[in-house]
């Protein structure tokens, strides 16, 4: 290390997530996983749970927390809720894998592209385009859903269906600039399904089980998407490295991983099919609880 470098510069260049150097993907996932466990402990100790049903119940009314088994039995009876969970889980399976290996792919695609400029562009893209997709999707779902609640299933199915070919193109373009254009469109499309999915999770769950509904929803999402997406893509990538170079192995691995958008679309189409019945039942059930 040259004496002229400050400690901040050294750390910035050599840190696990901030350098352009090749770091084993397993090591990164282990570090992030351990950090997440630590954060979960802090959240458990610091955050307080709000009153259940406070938005719907009369002032002073409180609903007791049901046992886990009772909550699970109730949620099992709501097929649209489960279809939504697997729809967003398989959709996020692809998007999390893309996020995990996008920087590695771009550095391999064009090593001469300034790395700091690249990560700034990616940060702005993820912070604006993805958020815009989520906002637009929520507004459109609410507007369309007033006429037909099946829109909460149709809209995610359409957006993910459109995201599939965009995702495939994104990994096979010849330059970083073209990749970023299609990646921006991809982020916009996959952000759209967030609003409708969370609306379904909260609306269909009984008032006194919404915390349990959210917890189980995120458990399924994280186990399949966050736990499975990057790991699956990394495993497939290692297999392709036996026959292809670094760039091609990433391209083929992400092409295979993108196929998981198909079960996501199917799941959301199933949501649209059964949602009217489940939505009506949820409104009647919650009205009784509120009284």
Regions found by a protein language model. Give the residues of each.
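A membrane-interface helix-boundary motif in multi-pass transporters
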Residues: 15-33, 151-154, 238-260
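Helix-to-loop junctions at the C-terminal end of transmembrane segments
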Residues: 134-149, 237-238
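Extracytoplasmic gate region of multi-pass secondary transporters
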Residues: 78-135, 190-194, 198, 225-233
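Flexible cytoplasmic inter-helical loops of multi-pass small-molecule transporters
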Residues: 45-70, 279-288
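C-terminal membrane-cytosol helix-exit motif in multi-pass small-molecule transporters
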Residues: 34-56, 267-272
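Loop-to-transmembrane helix entry/capping segments in MFS-fold secondary transporters
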Residues: 115-117, 207-217
């Amino acid at each position: 290390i040259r004496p002229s470098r400050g400690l901040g510069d050294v750390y910035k260049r050599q840190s696990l997530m901030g350098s352009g150097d090749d770091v084993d993907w397993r090591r990164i996932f282990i570090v992030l996983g351990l950090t997440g466990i630590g954060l979960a402990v802090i959240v458990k100790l610091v955050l307080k749970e709000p009153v259940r049903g406070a938005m719907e119940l009369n002032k002073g009314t409180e609903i007791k927390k049901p046992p886990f088994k009772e909550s699970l039995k109730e949620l099992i009876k709501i097929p649209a809720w489960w279809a939504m969970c697997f729809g967003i889980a398989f959709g996020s399976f692809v998007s999390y894998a893309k996020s995990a290996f996008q920087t590695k792919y771009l550095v391999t695609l064009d090593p001469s592209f300034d790395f700091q400029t690249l990560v700034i562009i990616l940060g702005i893209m993820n912070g604006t385009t993805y958020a815009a997709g989520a906002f637009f999707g929520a507004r459109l779902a609410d507007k369309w859903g007033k006429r037909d609640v099946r829109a909460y299933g149709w809209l995610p199915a359409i957006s993910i269906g459109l995201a599939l070919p965009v995702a495939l193109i994104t990994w096979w373009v010849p330059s970083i600039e073209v990749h970023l254009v299609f990646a921006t469109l991809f982020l916009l499309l996959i952000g759209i399904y967030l609003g409708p999915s969370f609306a379904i999770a909260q609306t269909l769950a009984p008032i006194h089980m919404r915390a349990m509904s959210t917890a189980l929803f995120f458990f399924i999402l994280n186990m399949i998407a966050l736990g499975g997406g990057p790991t699956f893509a990394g495993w497939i990538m290692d297999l392709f490295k036996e026959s292809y170079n670094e760039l091609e192995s990433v391209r083929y691995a992400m092409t295979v991983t993108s196929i998981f958008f198909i079960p996501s679309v199917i799941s959301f189409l199933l949501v649209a099919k059964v949602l009217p019945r489940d939505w009506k039942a949820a409104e009647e059930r919650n009205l009784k609880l509120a009284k």
